[in-house]
Every structure is written in C-alpha cells, then in structure tokens.
C-alpha cells in the first residue's frame, strides 16, 4: 500500500481514501508469502492508511514449523512490534489485529479456542506493556479457517471481536451460517 502514485496491480491509500474505504487488510499471509511483504513494509502500509484515516486490519500469524519448534510467541510479538513501530498512540486506537495462524489455513488443522485465546491474551498484554494501546481498546479478530463448524465458539468468545473469513466466504450458504452463529 503506497501513499500515492502509479503501481500496477496495487492500490494506494490515497485512492482508497477517495473511495471512502474505511478498512484495509495489511500483512495477510498470502501477501507475505507470495509477494515477500515484510513487517517493515506492513508498517509503511499501516502508517499510510492511518494518515488517510483508514483503519488497518493487521494480520499476523505463525507457520507450522514456528508453532512446533515452540518459538511462535516470540515470532508473533516481533511481527506486532515491527508492524506498529513509530505509530502515535492517539492514532492507533482504531487498528484491528487479525490473528491468522498460517498452520491452520487450508490445512484441515484448526486452532482450538484455547490456542486462539492464548495468543490474543499474550499479544494484548505485550501491546499494553509496550504502551502502544489501552488494552481495553485493542480489537482482535480471528482468521484461521473460520467455518460454520467453529464460528459459534470463536465469535461468541469474550476476547475475540470478530472473524476474518477466508474460503468460507466464497460459499454463500457457509457464510450465512457463520453470520448466524453470532449471539447478539
């Protein structure tokens, strides 16, 4: 996400602002994997979006290797820190963080609610200790193979603020079931 200019196949924060776009996903695992986007580039995108008053949805997540080797939490906290470097505290209340465990996307493996809550709780604690945010204002959504089978548990957890639905959003019936699983 460049601030402005012509970048074929990309869109700038300026263009999004002119279209009155309110939210933009940055750091998605597919962008990191296929386009080699780094945390530092995600940070540039986040700053460009905030400067245009667009809420960034910052994706972060670990691979299966990082998870099984046991160093995943350090990796995740590093992603968060590098993606939010240099942000003014008064500008970051609107950021949404999307926990997207790469090992649970399209693999048939699902993160348990306990896995999700563990990561989100530790990341919230880390962020508030670093004084980036007021812990109560930090918003987290989950995006690791959300389906009608796991959406009720995820979307009705007190610590998870929503879902970043991937493949299931392409099937209208599945997507409607996910939406209907929310207790209002």
Language model regions located:
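Active-site loop-to-helix "anion-binding N-cap" substructures in soluble metabolic enzymes
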Residues: 1-184
